[in-house]
Amino acid sequence: MAREDSVKCLRCLLYALNLLFWLMSISVLAVSAWMRDYLNNVLTLTAETRVEEAVILTYFPVVHPVMIAVCCFLIIVGMLGYCGTVKRNLLLLAWYFGSLLVIFCVELACGVWTYEQELMVPVQWSDMVTLKARMTNYGLPRYRWLTHAWNFFQREFKCCGVVYFTDWLEMTEMDWPPDSCCVREFPGCSKQAHQEDLSDLYQEGCGKKMYSFLRGTKQLQVLRFLGISIGVTQILAMILTITLLWALYYDRREPGTDQMMSLKNDNSQHLSCPSVELLKPSLSRIFEHTSMANSFNTHFEMEEL
């Protein structure tokens, strides 16, 4: 009974862990898909600069095809573990354990590789100034993708220019910054702000924002936390799976052992009952002789008196 309760507890824990696998894997895929589009605009601005290499080494492992494939495979493995737990199938649970072990090794290798790569390309503040070279083609029909990337970055990071908003006046033939530099954006807002109130423009340059971006965003921290959580959950799932495999295998062997023990007990009972019946006459004779001896001794003592 206690063993059966333990098996039920292990199965419930595996159900919960598989649910966590699904939720965390879907979360990683969703955030990675969002960051993939986000990074496309950042890489457009940093193309052919030292900053581009740093961005790739910092964020590429997050959206790496291997990482995406691991999360997709983990969802399938979670379904495999769920089916094996429901049906108490030793083969499915063994496949589940092996798959988790392989996925964990791949994730560990990716984590070590990412850590080593991040240490290889240090980025200095002076590297951010090189982004000014990407401003000269802003607004040209041939470089609409670059214009879109600059507008996207300035809106998202609430910045203007590289060092200051005057970079647009220095590096281009524009008389005022783009409208994406406005705190409250509307058509012609930058011209109005440049002529009336400069405080309506973002005062901080995008170089500092890019430098902070390379140090890690909240989304990157969330993904790293999810990656560590998935790894820890995998270790717990592997331990519980091994324990459940052992318990189910022991339960399948136990009924045969109990049957053999019951047969031995039945045989001993069958053997003991006839022997007791055979010993009953002998015991009765011994009891009669003992009673006669006691009565003779009592009679002899009475005659002496």
From Swiss-Prot:
Keywords: Angiogenesis, Cell membrane, Disease variant, Lipoprotein, Membrane, Palmitate, Transmembrane, Transmembrane helix
Result, substituting residue 83 to S: Impairs interaction with ADAM10
Residue intervals annotated with topology Extracellular: 34-59, 111-224
Listed PROSITE patterns: TM4_1
GO biological process, one term: cell surface receptor signaling pathway
Domain of life: Eukaryota
Bilayer topology: Multi-pass membrane protein
Implicated disorder: Vitreoretinopathy, exudative 5: A disorder of the retinal vasculature characterized by an abrupt cessation of growth of peripheral capillaries, leading to an avascular peripheral retina. This may lead to compensatory retinal neovascularization, which is thought to be induced by hypoxia from the initial avascular insult. New vessels are prone to leakage and rupture causing exudates and bleeding, followed by scarring, retinal detachment and blindness. Clinical features can be highly variable, even within the same family.
Sequence similarity: Belongs to the tetraspanin (TM4SF) family.
Function: Regulator of cell surface receptor signal transduction. Plays a central role in retinal vascularization by regulating norrin (NDP) signal transduction. Acts in concert with norrin (NDP) to promote FZD4 multimerization and subsequent activation of FZD4, leading to promote accumulation of beta-catenin (CTNNB1) and stimulate LEF/TCF-mediated transcriptional programs.
Name of this chain's protein: Tetraspanin-12
Species this protein is from: Homo sapiens (Human)
